[in-house]
């Protein structure tokens, strides 16, 4: 349902793997090394003891499920996504589709307040939940980015985190809902199927049998373009990653191709915070990451330039290749 990428994830090679788990309450000297190793080998990792209050997470999940449980006509009041707002099946502007409905929000407080009026019957409650969640995950993102910089031996460990705390940061929050498969014999269509995880735990977990393995695309193969993505999902699986840009680390860390499948009889909710720089910010490697022996692989460019290229291409297209340094003059700059 989504255009094939240059290096698609082959279904026959899909294997279950255990992602690295980073305990942020462990010794300060250990976390930077573990994060760098996880980024080099997987591009994904799980974080525990992260400090994001559980009540803030639950409030955000409750508001999300409450919105997606509304009739279609009510949800459409918050759309169409252009790019912000409510979207269903259509992803972006180039014809990509998937079995997903979503809310895309700018993290600017004023924008959240205005959008909430078309999203919720209680705009202040929704706006408060979103703002609290964004503040908490932004603080976590800053901590991870600073640990990452430390693990890379970058002298200025706040070189990345400063970009996402800038008042003009282009960070986003995307709430994704993947409905249950229509052909699942044990599909849960009751109102309780659209409840936060702490409510779902009281429900009977259905056995999907072979239907649960259907590879229907919820959100097709892609790489997140931002600096860092923090993903929270409920207890329903569906994320697949491909083990392989990397501008700010000069190719040392690579943004991993991944996709989401609607392979469950339960509704899947994911909340993704995309930590991004301001539009005017220049994207280039810190001095420690580019040396005469390992010159810059990419020419400097602004985040606005990259976003323009991103919106001109399909979901699975390679965008970073457009910015690769082509000659000695570009590398020297």
Which positions does each model-derived feature cover?
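Peripheral, non-catalytic segments flanking oxidoreductase cores
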Residues: 1-333
